[in-house]
Swiss-Prot record:
Site feature (Transition state stabilizer) residues: D352
Effect the entry attributes to changing D215A: Abolishes catalytic activity
Keywords, in A-Z order: Glycosidase, Hydrolase, Maltose metabolism, Mitochondrion
Entry protein name: Oligo-1,6-glucosidase IMA1
Domain of life the protein comes from: Eukaryota
Gene Ontology CC annotation, any one: mitochondrion
Catalysed conversion reaction: Hydrolysis of (1->6)-alpha-D-glucosidic linkages in some oligosaccharides produced from starch and glycogen by alpha-amylase, and in isomaltose
Originating species: Saccharomyces cerevisiae (strain ATCC 204508 / S288c)
Enzyme class: hydrolase
Length: 589
């Protein structure tokens, strides 16, 4: 590859070219039939991940935790949750990952910890404790007519209700933007930051991890004074804290400081990557986070494309959208890096998103496989670091018609209770909420991985075990590893081909630049071009169940059909009509 001086983003890095496979440890593979996935279960399936074509694994939190938010509430950063195994099991997993030629990335959850963490226990023990200022403690704003303390401001928790919890012992509130057992750490306190770096970052660097996925990495810097948020939702007492918590005044300073800690700590020459979950940010802010010269983050996750079709006021309020809206939002993931020294990611699924075929494809029995392959074609052709989530490679779909009682997610339960309290169980608000969770709940991604047709647990646990969460019935319909490996036309086997295609053409697939939409207003067709030196890639993707026409740019005869989701014998490369849910990639040199 020749690096273009006009495109410093094309400087090769292992973490730019790698395909990352995300593992949700509770739901991946149970090795001891206790109903929970574990470290040994992951280790037993590393060859499967390698054969898929992945180059790195990212494991969601496996640390000691009360599991109020599935491990994103950490009680000890230096200990594996015993249900998942021992620290030694984890070190062995890191070693095996490296022996197979893959990298190991772990989740870094340091905006908040668990209320069971020793730091918080000390902090809440008294107002004069040395760690009191490691968290945000504030007296009540006042008391209501019933004598109940009023929270210090009107900030809303991401999980519903107030972002403050009252502590009876010291008669003060503590801030927790998420769950009541996830107190926010005070990054303004230097001693607190040093302890975070040492315990959550340094310990795992010393044990060989290759990078960190940084949870809610845009929330560390809160505006001093924690003022009331502007009222944007007149139907709620509680308002989004984003103006005072998202991409705050010292956020870049904090990331530079942590990046410096990482570079100082690693002595063996390995290059550590960091990917920040940065929610929403302007292009300029994204460039500040990921510019190589600024030493903050390697790359980031943005939510623009996964939030399409949801209200900015409340995620669980669906709004209509068209393909054009999604195309524009998806391109926001990578267009800002063009001609810079920045980098980004591409993904459709993770532990916080539903299944992409249900959300953006067609999960009907007729079109599930072909639309799942279409999404794979799209992802394989986009610029940035590609992330694939467990089960995505199988063409997994959302579960169907579950009552709210079956949902496990604390975000669903807390919002359900908040809506019930504020609007009532039979309200229009509740009806909209239940409609939304059927489409976009995080729980759709969290059902146990489907390894086989074996009843009743699909090979995730032994037949006599009771998994921690219900299974998706789709394992009985062929959506499982064992069936798909045997089926040459399965989504799984297609993903293997897609990742081979991406690697074989990495100059233009991974590093391609100057992305341009073709026929942006088209409601069925997603088509674009991008370049790398003298090469041009042209993609034509039919996001509909109808045959759809397309045009090759400038009728250029040098474009050769390189990849698509229909069998080659069924495709006339000279045809300008796409079959339902057909995607094609052409390259000219």
């Amino acid at each position: 590859m020749t690096i273009s001086s006009a495109h410093p983003e094309t400087e090769p890095k292992w973490w730019k070219e790698a395909t990352f496979y995300q593992i949700y440890p509770a739901s991946f593979k149970d090795s001891n039939d206790d109903g929970w996935g574990d470290m040994k279960g992951i280790a037993s399936k590393l060859e499967y991940i390698k054969e898929l074509g992945a180059d790195a694994i990212w494991i969601s939190p496996f640390y000691d935790s009360p599991q109020d938010d599935m491990g994103y509430d950490i009680a000890n950063y230096e200990k594996v949750w015993p249900t998942y195994g021992t620290n030694e099991d984890c070190f062995a997993l890191i070693e095996k990952t490296h022996k197979l030629g893959m990298k190991f990335i772990t989740d870094l959850v340091i905006n908040h910890c668990s209320s069971e963490h020793e730091w918080f226990k000390e902090s809440r023990s008294s107002k004069t404790n040395p760690k009191r200022d490691w968290f945000f403690w504030r007296p009540p704003k006042g008391y209501d007519a019933e004598g109940k303390p009023i929270p210090p401001n009107n900030w809303k928790s991401y999980f519903g209700g107030s972002a403050w919890t009252f502590d009876e012992k010291t008669q003060e509130f503590y801030l927790r933007l998420f769950c009541s057992t996830q107190p926010d750490l005070n990054w303004e306190n230097e001693d607190c930051r040093k302890a975070i770096y040492e315990s959550a970052v340094g310990y795992w660097l010393d044990h060989g991890v290759d990078g960190f996925r940084i949870d809610v990495g845009s929330l560390y810097s809160k505006v001093v004074g924690l003022p009331d948020a502007p009222v944007v939702d007149k139907n709620s007492t509680w308002q989004s804290s984003d103006p005072y918590t998202l991409n705050g005044p010292r956020i870049h300073e904090f990331h530079q400081e942590m990046n410096q800690f990482i570079r100082n700590r690693v002595k063996d020459g390995r290059e550590i990557m960091t990917v920040g979950e940065m929610q929403h940010a302007s292009d300029e802010t994204k460039r500040l986070y990921t510019s190589a010269s600024r030493h903050e983050l390697s790359e980031l996750f943005n939510f623009s494309h996964t939030d399409v079709g949801t209200s900015p006021l409340f995620r669980y309020n669906l709004v209509p959208f068209e393909l054009k809206d999604w195309k524009i939002a998806l391109a926001e993931l990578f267009r800002y890096i063009n001609g810079t020294d920045c980098w980004s990611t591409i993904y459709l699924e993770n532990h916080d998103q539903p299944r992409s075929i249900t959300r953006f494809g067609d999960d009907s029995p007729k079109n599930r496989v072909i639309s799942g392959k279409l999404l794979s074609v799209l992802l394989s052709a986009l610029t940035g670091t590609l992330y694939v989530y467990q089960g995505q490679e199988l063409g997994q779909i959302n579960f169907k018609n579950w009552p709210v009682e079956k949902y496990e997610d604390v975000e669903i339960r807390n919002n359900y209770n908040a809506i019930k309290e504020e609007h009532g169980e039979n309200s229009e608000e509740m009806k909209k909420f239940l409609e939304a969770i059927a489409l976009i709940s995080r729980d759709h991604a969290r059902t146990p991985m489907q390894w086989s047709r074996e009843e009743p647990n699909a090979g995730f646990s032994g037949p006599s075990a009771k998994p921690w969460f219900y299974l998706n019935d789709s394992f009985r319909e062929g959506i499982n590893v064992e069936d798909e490996i045997k089926d040459p036309n399965s989504v799984l086997n297609f993903w293997k081909e897609a990742l081979k295609f991406r690697k074989a053409h990495k100059d233009i697939t991974v590093y391609g630049y100057d992305f341009e939409f073709i026929d942006l207003d088209n409601k069925k067709l997603f088509s674009f071009t991008k370049k790398y030196n003298n090469k041009t890639l042209f993609a034509a993707l039919n996001f509909s169940s109808d045959a759809t026409d397309f045009k090759i740019p400038n009728d250029d005869s040098s474009f050769k059909l390189e990849f698509g989701n229909y069998p080659k014998k069924e495709v006339d490369a000279s045809s300008r009509t796409l079959k339902p849910w057909e995607g094609r990639i052409y390259i000219s040199e």
